[in-house]
UniProtKB/Swiss-Prot annotation:
Gene3D superfamilies: N-(1-d-carboxylethyl)-l-norvaline Dehydrogenase, domain 2, NAD(P)-binding Rossmann-like Domain
Name this polypeptide is given: Altronate oxidoreductase
Family: Belongs to the mannitol dehydrogenase family. UxaB subfamily.
UniProt GO molecular function: mannitol-1-phosphate 5-dehydrogenase activity; tagaturonate reductase activity
Species for this entry: Escherichia fergusonii (strain ATCC 35469 / DSM 13698 / CCUG 18766 / IAM 14443 / JCM 21226 / LMG 7866 / NBRC 102419 / NCTC 12128 / CDC 0568-73)
Enzyme superclass (EC): oxidoreductase
Gene Ontology CC: one annotated term: cytosol
UniProt entry keywords in alphabetical sequence: NAD, Oxidoreductase
Cited Pfam families: Mannitol_dh, Mannitol_dh_C
Residues given in the record as NAD(+) binding sites: I18, I19, Q20, F21, G22, E23, G24, N25, F26, L27, R28, A29
EC annotation from Swiss-Prot or TrEMBL: 1.1.1.58
Length: 483
């Protein structure tokens, strides 16, 4: 069986116009996949050079396959049908290592056609590293490497205004474009680079903040033999992802034309502010996950897919989304409902086995950031507590007992909560404290909740009632009235 390469698998090759920091699965099944579609259907005509930003030889370089690899996109489409689509990606030309090919890295700045910079260097990637110097070959941090590359471009083209770049980071931090820009400016000032360069950075370059959304499941280790047989070739960089994707870019309106989105519509939004889209994702997608996990797991289910195929648990989650989360969010209802519909479809994806216990990690913080704002907004708007979001809090507290049907399971959270719950549930079992007292102690933790939740009218009582129902009847019986 042949391995992918451009000699045996000839086809389109595009001039290099995009630099991408990061060789991982996410960018390959998200950014490069979208660029490939735009190259095929429009005159975008842009090839990608992947820069490996860290010093590692694993996985091997994409250049071993001349940049070629296959994406397998699978899940439920808009009609709820299971689909699987294999695509040979030709948008990546080569990969270089900034550590072993530093001169080649700097030469990327000399190419007049270069226009875009994408990156995913993990959440920790957009950070300051003290001690990074201009003459380091290379500097340690991604922002320092980018500053050096931008200065190379500025110098090579004598500060030409039309040679700036559109920089689109995909790291999962708030306002990633602003954060990256601030660090680039910090290094420029720290390294005492000319004032003209700092002005050029501001005037000729755009740093765009983004929101990225797609579950990328990566290399399908367990299915490789079968998939390669179907494809008819060997591919060491196979990359699998869900059907759904969304790319929200906070940037100039002209970006839509530059990316040719006017000629081939992708699920890419160019917006003035990503904040409402971030809130929508956190509240609906992440919030639904967080409400679902402790309820479904204690009802005897193990994966998100099983939960969504369970009529009662599915009804609980959908009612939480449509009746309690969406009404308090600040975007057009139609847009929110369309997003919610896509979310529940994603949860049902038969190709992804999303373990509830893995999503349960750090559940206390997730509840505070993802559900509490909607719970409190609902109470403020209606004068009553949203029943399902409140029940989810009771289910979460019950989850920290660490026991289901007489069997223990691992609970992962910070040490403070693990110790606290161990102590509280032990006291509860021994009859030292009652359910209402246990709930009040948890809700009074100001350092965690950033407020004293025992002051929210009726919250302690309602959570305690729900928790008693869970303890006495079991999760199935307790949740039924809310389904």
């Amino acid at each position: 069986m042949k391995t992918l390469n451009r000699r045996d698998f000839p086809g389109a090759q595009y001039p290099e116009r995009i630099i991408q920091f990061g060789e991982g699965n996410f960018l390959r099944a998200f950014v490069d996949w979208q660029i490939d579609l735009l190259n095929e259907h429009t005159d975008l005509n842009s090839g990608v050079v992947v820069v490996r930003p860290i010093e590692t030889s694993f996985p091997p370089s994409l250049s071993t396959q001349d940049g070629l690899y296959t994406t397998i996109i699978r899940g439920l489409n808009e009609k709820g049908e299971a689909v699987s689509d294999a695509r040979l990606i030709r948008s990546v030309n080569r990969e270089i290592s900034v550590y072993s090919e530093y001169d080649e890295f700097l030469k990327l700045a000399h190419n007049p056609e270069m226009r875009f910079v994408f990156s995913n260097t993990t959440e920790a990637g957009i950070s300051y590293h003290a001690g990074d110097k201009f003459d380091d070959a290379p500097a340690v941090s991604y922002p320092a490497k980018l500053t050096r590359l931008l200065f190379e471009r500025f110098s090579h083209f004598n500060g030409a205004q039309d040679k700036g770049w559109i920089i689109i980071p995909c790291e999962l931090i708030d306002y990633n474009g602003d954060a990256l820009r601030e660090l680039v400016l910090r290094y420029a000032q720290e390294w005492a680079l000319p004032e003209a360069f700092i002005q050029w950075l501001d005037q000729a370059n755009s740093f765009c903040s983004t929101l990225v959304d797609r579950i990328v499941t990566g290399y399908p280790r367990d299915e490789v033999t079968k998939l390669e047989e179907e494809l008819g070739y060997h591919d060491g960089f196979l990359d699998t992802a869900e059907h759904f994707y969304l790319f929200v870019i906070q940037g100039p309106k002209s970006l839509a034309t530059e990316l040719r989105l006017d000629k081939y519509p992708l699920n890419v939004l160019i917006v003035d502010d990503i904040k409402p889209y971030k809130e929508r994702k956190v509240a609906i997608l992440n919030g639904a996950h967080t409400a679902l996990v402790p309820v479904a797991f204690q009802a005897g289910l193990d994966t998100v897919g099983e939960a969504m195929n369970d009529a009662e648990i599915c009804a609980f989650v959908e009612k939480a989304i449509y009746e309690e989360i969406i009404p308090v969010l600040d975007l057009p209802r139609e847009e929110l409902e369309s997003f919610a519909s896509a979310v529940t479809g994603r949860f049902r994806n038969p190709y992804i086995k999303h373990q509830l216990l893995s999503i349960a990690l750090n559940g206390m913080t997730k509840f505070r950031t993802r559900i509490l704002p909607q719970l409190l907004a609902g109470q403020k708007a209606n004068g009553t507590l949203p029943a399902r979001l409140t029940f989810a809090l009771a289910a979460l507290i019950a989850f920290y007992r660490g026991e289901r049907n007489g069997e223990t399971y691992p609970v992962q959270d910070d040490a403070h909560w693990l110790e606290r719950y161990q102590q509280l549930w032990s006291q509860h079992r021994d009859g030292v404290i009652g359910t209402q007292e246990l709930v009040a102690i948890v809700l009074a933790e100001k350092d965690h909740w950033e407020q004293d939740l025992t002051q929210v009218p009726g919250l302690v009582e309602l959570v305690a009632n729900d928790l008693d129902a869970i303890l006495e009847k079991g999760m199935r019986e307790a949740v039924r009235p809310l389904c």
